[in-house]
Amino acid sequence: MTRSFLDLADAGAAGVRLMLDEAVSRKKARAGLPKGAPDRDAPLAGHTLAMIFEKNSTRTRVSFDMAMRQLGGTTIVMDAGSMQLGRGETIADTARVLSRYVDAIMIRTDDHRKAVDLARYADVPVINGLTDRSHPCQIMADLQTILEHKGRVEGLGWAWLGDGNNVLHSIVEAGSLLGFPVRIGCPEGYDPDAEVLAEARARGGDILLSRDPAEVVRGADVVVTDTWISMGQAHAEEKLAAMMPFQVDEARMAQAAPDAAFLHCLPAHRGEEVVDAVIDGPHSLIWDEAENRLHAQKAVLLWCLGRLG
């Protein structure tokens, strides 16, 4: 059975836990292997992943490519300038054609609806590599990182400071599925999507939205932020001024739990959402987090292609 992975809820709590266990296990099993060597069982030998990029990427592109290589498979990379989808071919037609050529499709796009439509018309699994609504693969890596360092994810308090964006949406979703509270600190006008919050609360999610960054971070086990300003974004100076009280600096981290972890999906704008002393400091797990994109996405690929559960 094949399954698409557009949001964490597609897998449910049991599926997410299954993928996390697989990611941790496969990472340990690779000890001593060169990065380009396949896993010893090469479970996706002969399989091909098509990767559609409508947004530039470093981590998503390299981590998915290496994930498929380590699983024994191959990838094909496409962008809007090199495929007919960028010149008027419908999503439905693209999905049907690609389904005849490849075993799975990953898409990174500004338009979540495209990912949904691609999954609707494709006969193979579709994976959300990032959309304007959510970033589930990133949060799988975040969850794996916390699981490795703290031994659990359930019950740990997560604090988010900054823009109410796609990464936050997936954290909120994860909290509602796995049972950890999420406290959100955003300036007025930059809140997360109300529908995302409502869906999470309907699943029993414990969510606090506050304008007070100290209230949000106090005692938190995990502190997370992301870039505030996207390339070419209008009114950047106005947004930057609104966000500055939510910067993660040493004083803010000191308000969290003594052993709190700091996460950032990268790339970081140092001196804006986070200062060097935090991102390079003892609380920071960002390099493990970045590496775990690879391992978490291997588990996602296996789940989507019916090799897990």
Curated annotation (Swiss-Prot):
Pfam families: OTCace, OTCace_N
Pathway(s) per entry: Amino-acid biosynthesis; L-arginine biosynthesis; L-arginine from L-ornithine and carbamoyl phosphate: step 1/3
Record bears the keyword Cytoplasm: yes
Record-listed E.C. numbers: 2.1.3.3
Gene3D superfamilies documented for this protein: Aspartate/ornithine carbamoyltransferase (3.40.50.1370)
Keyword set, alphabetical order: Amino-acid biosynthesis, Arginine biosynthesis, Cytoplasm, Transferase
Chain ranges passing through the membrane: none
Residue runs in coiled coils: none
GO MF entries: amino acid binding; ornithine carbamoyltransferase activity
Gene Ontology biological process terms, A to Z: arginine biosynthetic process via ornithine; citrulline biosynthetic process; L-arginine biosynthetic process
Sequence positions that bind carbamoyl phosphate: S57, T58, R59, T60, Q84, R108, H135, P136, C137, Q138, C265, L266, R293
Main location per the UniProt record: cytoplasm
Top EC category: transferase
Cited InterPro entries: Asp/Orn_carbamoyltranf_P-bd, Asp/Orn_carbamoylTrfase, Asp/Orn_carbamoylTrfase_sf, Asp_carbamoyltransf_Asp/Orn-bd, Orn/put_carbamltrans, OTCase_ArgI
Catalysed transformations (reactions): carbamoyl phosphate + L-ornithine = L-citrulline + phosphate + H(+)
Similarity comment: family membership: Belongs to the aspartate/ornithine carbamoyltransferase superfamily. OTCase family.
Function: Reversibly catalyzes the transfer of the carbamoyl group from carbamoyl phosphate (CP) to the N(epsilon) atom of ornithine (ORN) to produce L-citrulline.
Name of this protein: Ornithine carbamoyltransferase
Organism of derivation: Rhizorhabdus wittichii (strain DSM 6014 / CCUG 31198 / JCM 15750 / NBRC 105917 / EY 4224 / RW1)
